[in-house]
Amino acid sequence: MGQGRIYVLEDEVAVRTVLVEALGSAGHDVREFGDGQLALDEIDRAVPDLILLDMRMPRMDGFKFLNLLRRKPAAKALPVIIVSGLGDELLRAIDARAAEELGVVGIFAKPFDIPTLLRYVGSVIARDTRSGTRPPNP
């Protein structure tokens, strides 16, 4: 699995901790944020290779975050994987075309399988460094 800089946006500390530890153990450089605005501010300084995004966060939901993210020239093509407890509700709200426009490359419903998520993260990061083709949805 390739190494990459990953930003994890998740307001639930327990879930964020699991993600950060799993990604870090897989060799990724991980930054964690409980607030979307803090992540947007950090992206102005250092653009990651990938973002894992919870859609339901206080102060700024995932849709607002994605819209603000895409206004940043350096982050227009930045891949995002949604990790959300909204599950089927979210899948109904975000169709494939909307996902493509927002740069969403995958959606994982909570509770998610860590090994599957890690494999998918690795494929997204490897794809970015190799061919620019999108991996199949998980």
Task: Locate each region found by the language model.
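Conserved acidic carboxylate
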Residues: E10
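Receiver (REC) domain active-site loop signature in two-component systems and cognate sites
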Residues: M57
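Active-site residues of response regulator receiver
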Residues: D54, S84
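His-Asp phosphorelay/catalytic-motif detector in bacterial-type signaling
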Residues: V47-D49, A74-I81
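Charged docking surfaces used in two-component/phosphorelay signaling
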Residues: T17-S25
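Acidic, metal-coordinating helix/loop segments flanking the phosphotransfer/catalytic sites
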Residues: E32-L50
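C-terminal output helix
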Residues: A109-V121
